[in-house]
Design a protein with these regions (language model features):
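Short, solvent-exposed, charged loop/turn and helix-capping segments
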Residues: 102-127, 141-145, 175-180
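N-terminal signal peptide c-region/cleavage motif recognized by signal peptidases
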Residues: 20-23
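Heptad-repeat alpha-helical coiled-coil/4-helix-bundle sensor or tether segments in soluble regions
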Residues: 127-133
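Bacterial N-terminal signal peptides that target proteins for export
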Residues: 1-12
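Structural signal for well-ordered, non-membrane alpha-helices
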Residues: 103-106, 110, 133, 137, ...
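Hydrophobic helical h-region of N-terminal Sec-dependent signal peptides
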Residues: 13-17
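Boundary of Sec targeting at the N-terminus
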Residues: 26-27
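C-terminal amphipathic alpha-helix
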Residues: 30-98, 136-197
Length: 197
């Protein structure tokens, strides 16, 4: 026996509600807990992205949510590796974990659908991640050869990555001039926390 028209409408409505709920959950990749890894701390006043991303147009929210979730994970991986390099202890395994993490994050970021107009920001973020990977490979080698942190911070790619993150911040400011302070500050501090300087 076929369902009545009323039953079919209710079933369709229920399915649409389920799909909408699933879609919203899938779009929110940002973690609820942003605590830094044990024994590390963020170098700036990092706060979680505000839920719903006030001030970010709806068409950009999924991209911004996914991007900043990845930037947070890259920052956490950076903190663990930087601690190992500073302490000159456990560098190789920390470098291997960092490489695996950031390569995966960069690959996912590179395959993300980029809203029109955000392409230069995307290029800066991916460029900064690549430069930081080069920086950390060189930094690990320097520390393992007995060099100090002054030599590590002299590695050119670290400054170049910093410049790309500053450019990324400028692009975000230009795109969202009317965003509220909580959104602006959180986005700024995500880029600041990933930076090396």
């Amino acid at each position: 026996m076929a369902p009545s028209a009323s039953e079919a409408r209710r079933a369709t409505a229920a399915l649409l509600l389920l799909l909408a709920a699933t879609s919203g959950a899938a779009q929110d990749a940002y973690p609820t807990d942003i605590t830094p890894p044990p024994g590390t701390r963020y170098p700036c006043a990092l706060t979680a992205l505000p839920r719903g991303l006030p001030g970010i147009p709806e068409g950009d929210r999924s991209y911004v949510n996914h991007t900043y979730a990845r930037l947070l994970r890259a920052t956490q991986a950076k903190l663990v590796l930087l601690k190992a390099i500073e302490e000159a202890r456990g560098i190789e395994p920390a470098l291997a974990r960092y490489r695996d993490t950031t390569r995966g994050l960069a690959a996912r970021q590179g395959s993300e659908a980029v809203p029109v107009g955000i392409e230069p920001f995307q290029a800066d973020v991916l460029g900064a991640l690549e430069l930081q990977q080069i920086f950390f490979a060189k930094a690990a080698a320097l520390r393992q050869s007995g060099r100090g942190m002054d030599a590590v911070y002299g590695v050119r790619e670290g400054r170049e990555a910093s410049a790309r993150l500053i450019a990324a911040w400028s692009r975000m400011q230009g795109r969202y001039p009317g965003w509220p302070p909580a959104t602006r500050d959180s986005i700024y501090h995500h880029l600041c926390a990933l930076d090396l300087f």
